[in-house]
Regions:
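Active-site pocket-lining/capping segments in soluble small-molecule metabolic enzymes
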Residues: 1-22, 59-122, 140-142, 149-186
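Active-site glycine-rich loop that binds ribose-phosphate moieties when present
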Residues: 22-38
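Conserved, mostly hydrophobic/aromatic
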Residues: 35, 39, 72, 134, ...
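Catalytic beta/alpha-barrel core
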Residues: 41-50, 135-137
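Active-site glycine- and acidic-residue-rich loops that bind
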Residues: 45-58, 81, 142-145
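Charge-patterned, long linear interaction tracts outside catalytic cores
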Residues: 124-147
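Ferredoxin-type iron-sulfur electron-transfer modules and their immediate structural context
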Residues: 176-338
Length: 338
């Protein structure tokens, strides 16, 4: 949004459509709405090989009449590259055991050029689907580019159905599940405790922070010079931290955003993301592996309580560094008018 104010920028955003649990997929698309609202001019997808997911991404833009161009990230996937990404657990990349078996067999049989055939086919399929272009990754050497160009020319006159048939043959796809991860579940409901917690905190937020009376009383209390006193300010901050940390994971950010995040604190995201998820989740799990992604929890809860528009529309500002370590209660009431 800041770049838009300066002008001269063509702003691109990343998007990962290769999500297979309902909540993490919903969270990705809800954030894409926000990115477009914030001023995205074009979209670049994560690297991936599931053409159905790319079709869904393009269909989403068409359905919502978004004019932004979308580009697909593509890569000639060799066994070495696939093994590297698996070894280093590159976040957000889906490479299935079936894909590894196909690549291993091709290497054994001396058919490694199939990686460039598939890349050429994927580029041409994306063109048929209405993608504006591709981001070609890991194809740097002139001989690699010439090989890719050779197969693009070879398949250029194929129709979409012919390309899809050849793609499926090269990946040995028979059930359409070969290029997607195995799911322990697709959809989950929020727990009763999550629903009760949301309802209680929502009631408290409305009563204590959004009602006209609360705003007036809060503004009157916190405009007093008392709170400029260091001991009083420290006591206030400590009181706020104790009351919120155990319930929502407060980290004294100074600019509480709970009302815009369904009372799931963005400070509990390892990356501190408030507007939605990164692209690195795997089946609802955070890329750090120690927790469920809070944005999946949030998307699941939003659907259950009819609040998906909040996650779709509300652009949450970054917390200024100078605000951190101050009382969000005081900052809230002084920034609002009764």
């Amino acid at each position: 949004m800041a770049a838009k104010c300066y002008g001269g920028f063509h702003i691109g955003v990343a998007f990962n459509p290769f999500k297979y649990a309902e909540a993490e997929r919903d969270a990705q698309y809800l954030k894409l709405h926000k990115k477009i609202k914030a001023g995205a001019d074009f979209i670049v997808t994560q690297l991936g090989y599931d053409m159905e997911a790319l079709k869904q991404a393009k269909a989403f833009l068409n359905r919502h009449r978004y004019p932004q161009n979308i580009l697909a990230c593509v890569m000639p996937l060799s066994l070495a590259r696939a093994n590297f990404m698996m070894k280093h657990k590159i976040a957000g990349i889906v490479i299935t055991p079936h894909m590894l078996r196909v690549l291993a067999q091709e290497k054994q049989d001396g058919r490694t050029e199939n990686a460039y055939k598939r890349c050429a086919i994927q580029i041409l399929m994306c063109k048929y689907l209405g993608f504006a272009g591709v981001h070609l990754s890991a194809c740097h050497k002139p001989e690699e580019q010439k090989l890719l160009e050779k197969y693009i020319e070879q398949y250029r006159h194929y129709g979409l159905q012919e390309l899809e048939a050849l793609w499926n043959a090269l990946w040995q796809v028979k059930t359409k599940n070969e290029l997607v991860p195995e799911l322990a579940y697709y959809s989950r409901q929020p727990s009763s405790s999550q629903l009760i917690k949301y309802q209680q905190l929502h009631f408290m937020h409305k009563a204590l922070f959004e009602s006209k009376i609360a705003k007036g009383v809060g503004h009157f209390i916190f405009k007093a010079s008392l709170w400029e006193n260091t001991p009083a300010a420290k006591a206030l901050l400590k009181t706020e931290f104790i009351s919120k940390q155990g319930v929502v994971g407060c980290e004294s950010c100074g600019q509480c955003r709970l009302g815009d995040t369904l009372y799931i604190c963005p400070e509990t995201c390892p990356k501190g993301l408030a507007n939605g998820p990164c692209g690195g989740t795997t089946l609802d799990r955070c890329e750090f592996g120690d927790r469920e992604c809070i944005h999946s929890v949030k998307a699941r809860l939003a659907k259950a309580v009819g609040q998906t528009d909040v996650l779709k529309e509300k652009l949450i500002p970054t917390v200024p560094i100078e605000v951190r370590g101050t009382s969000s209660w005081k900052n809230w009431y002084l920034a609002t008018e009764a």
